[in-house]
Amino acid sequence: MKITKIEKKKRLYLIELDNDDSLYVTEDTIVRFMLSKDKVLDNDQLEDMKHFAQLSYGKNLALYFLSFQQRSNKQVADYLRKHEIEEHIIADIITQLQEEQWIDDTKLADTYIRQNQLNGDKGPQVLKQKLLQKGIASHDIDPILSQTDFTQLAQKVSQKLFDKYQEKLPPKALKDKITQALLTKGFSYDLAKHSLNHLNFDQDNQEIEDLLDKELDKQYRKLSRKYDGYTLKQRLYQALYRKGYNSDDINCKLRNYL
């Protein structure tokens, strides 16, 4: 087969052959196989060229994808599949990128966890789930998590939540709110409970009464649209009790309110 045309198309070259076949190749392919118009290729040379062309093109795609941020082996492989790179070529590209240290799942997991320690708010359980979603194996994640102390991060997150809700909730509800938020973020129950120890939940009676008055007004506006009489009173009691207010305080307020 003879090359009848070589035409540059942005980052690729269009190769046309005298058997009406055509393909796109990278500049590396042109150089490696010393391609030029009228050059004759046998079947083996053509197959070698096609293989190298896709390998070169796929690797360039992968390096472009990696130029934005670190990626896992799986993320790179999935990206190449979207660009219709063949599976055996993808395997070769992944191997090359690993050997050249462009991708390393263990380093990616370590970086992700360290960045979370500095700027994030996720506990170990959520971190592991996020990394598993990136295609990183548990055996690359677990050793790093086991060596990471999440105590200070849990305290930082709990302090932030405390500052946000302390003027909105009574002590019991505030503790429950912070604990549940930490569990949702992936911290263990023991660590969530421990993080509460450095917070001051003391509120004077007037502060609690003011919060109760405010919450009672809010719940009344909401529930009085649907209920009245005894049912309204029961609904108000239940709503306020769930918010963490003392039963005697609620009953006292309701007697004077309704």
Curated annotation (Swiss-Prot):
It is found in: Cytoplasm. Belongs to the RecX family. InterPro entries: RecX_HTH_1st, RecX_HTH_2nd, RecX_HTH_3rd, Regulatory_RecX, WH-like_DNA-bd_sf. Pfam families: RecX_HTH1, RecX_HTH2, RecX_HTH3. It comes from the Bacteria. GO terms for biological process: regulation of DNA repair. The keyword Cytoplasm applies. This is Regulatory protein RecX. One of its GO terms (cellular component) is cytoplasm. Modulates RecA activity. Its main location: cytoplasm. The gene is recX. Keywords: Cytoplasm. The keyword Cytoplasm applies. Signal peptide: none annotated. It comes from Streptococcus pyogenes serotype M2 (strain MGAS10270).
